[in-house]
Amino acid sequence: MGNPRGRRTNGSIKTSKGTQRGTVSNLLSDQPLAARPKVSIVSNDDSQDSSDGGAFTTPSTTESTLKTTINGTDSTERNMSRKPSSPMAPAFMVSAPGKVIVYGEHAVVHGKAAMAAAISLRSYLLVTTLSKSQRTITMNFRDIGLDHTWNIDELPWDVFHHPSKKKFYYDLVTSLDPELVAAIQPHADAVSPDKPEDVRKIHRRSASAFLYLFLSLGSSQNPGAIYTLRSTIPIGAGLGSSASVCVCLSAALLLQIRTLAGPHPDQPPDEAEVQIERINRWAFVGEMCTHGNPSGVDNTVSAGGKAVVFRREDYSKPPTVTPLLNFPELPLLLVDTRQSRSTAVEVAKVGKLKDEYPVVTDSILEAIDQVTLAAQQKIQEISTNGISYRTLEDLGTLIRINHGFLVSLGVSHPRLERIRELVDYADIGWTKLTGAGGGGCAITLLRPDIKEEAVRELEEKLSAEGFVKYETTLGGDGIGVLWPAVLRNGTDEEGGEEIDQQKFENAVGTEGIERLVGVGVQEKREGWKFWKRSPRFS
């Protein structure tokens, strides 16, 4: 199977100061790292389709241009090129947030509206290109113990690129092709042979999503690469961890085949929206590999950030998405029950209830829809001066009502109810389950006038009963890119600090990851750029 690991020596990519890097896509300056200015990208949106056998090669001088901005002044645009013998592409990183469904879970699967908001817990994907002789791809998802390498030349390219099967980066894919799924199955089944079956099941789903996207968007001439993922999002807790990963994979692969432009400060709003939607569509394909029949809300909010009201009545058509760009940043108490559950199982539970009691279940789903729409109206009325206490109370009341309907659908859990009981007793906010239920997490919208002592007492009780608390914020950025994977934490003379792959893999916990890559609330470093929705699309 070739190089069994496909890894680079010492797991890092080092470039001495003053050495020019190879240029890949429209995202690199050809200046030395130490003197690299802030960069904005100008690119033609239809640069290349993914059927090109050389999809991962650098664009020619006629295919891309780069506009740099130094101290606020645009420099002359210049074409980029590199010789075939130029160095390998530098490592880059993408990051996408988790989400909470604030209103409308389960109803959204049945064509109703849901409101979801990005949270400050995120996934990070480091992409390291290997030498030409290393014909392997490695998927290293450290936080779930998945680390597997495939030989690129042994993958089923003939099936994925058959004229009757081939999909292009701009296509809308609303269902998985059974023949393509069957073609990757042996390769997905090969992962983690020594792991317990419950772990292998998770690993196989992750591998299936990765391979389906890789084979759909790439080509047999792809260079070898290592895809290293770390996440601060609790897994299996209803926080969109799998969608966050799929958004990262989608963005990374689309960047590698040069079909994304930007992000940059002066990117036209319609172009940014096209880029977000392109990432989102392929992330949804990955989600189908993972969940079977996902609603699409998780990947939509992870790709675009902030908050959205989402409705998908016809799965053969794109969903209706209304961004809520004035969604206020609200501190949230997020509590993990530590009770694992399956989204597919909980969705099937509601489906069965609907089959047995269609009129009653439809009434509950319609009521949840009305809760979501009422909350949307409240948020759209928020002024630039911030949210009023009355509006916050209204949103809290709707959270409480929504939770009651979810209990009626049978998707709560005793540990979720215990969290709600403890929070209600402390009287610090309004609580509901978020996501599929059956375990996972509860969210509490906090009152603005709570006493610190009450919060501390609640935290002690939650900890004593085995719950895990996260402090997070609603309404942050969506998909972002750090290209190259350099932290802008030095002076202009010093350049930046490259992300060492070994350090990235070994970062401990949420704080360690955030401290290293710096996107979350605790740390923010210059260098990350995010695609942002425009008010014209709200």
Swiss-Prot record:
Keywords: ATP-binding, Cytoplasm, Kinase, Lipid biosynthesis, Lipid metabolism, Magnesium, Metal-binding, Nucleotide-binding, Steroid biosynthesis, Steroid metabolism, Sterol biosynthesis, Sterol metabolism, Transferase
Composition skew (Low complexity), residue ranges: 57-69
Composition skew (Polar residues), residue ranges: 9-29
Enzyme Commission number(s): 2.7.1.36
GO cellular component: cytosol
Listed cofactors: Mg(2+)
Localization, UniProt: Cytoplasm, Cytosol
Pathway(s) of this molecule: Isoprenoid biosynthesis; isopentenyl diphosphate biosynthesis via mevalonate pathway; isopentenyl diphosphate from (R)-mevalonate: step 1/3
Record: residues binding ATP: K99, S231, G236, A237, G238, L239, G240, S241, S242
Residues the entry annotates as binding Mg(2+): S242, E287
Function per UniProt: Mevalonate kinase; part of the second module of ergosterol biosynthesis pathway that includes the middle steps of the pathway. Erg12 converts mevalonate into 5-phosphomevalonate. The second module is carried out in the vacuole and involves the formation of farnesyl diphosphate, which is also an important intermediate in the biosynthesis of ubiquinone, dolichol, heme and prenylated proteins. Activity by the mevalonate kinase erg12 (AFUA_4G07780) first converts mevalonate into 5-phosphomevalonate.
NCBIfam families in the record: mevalon_kin (TIGR00549)
Subunit structure: Homodimer.
Name of protein: Mevalonate kinase erg12
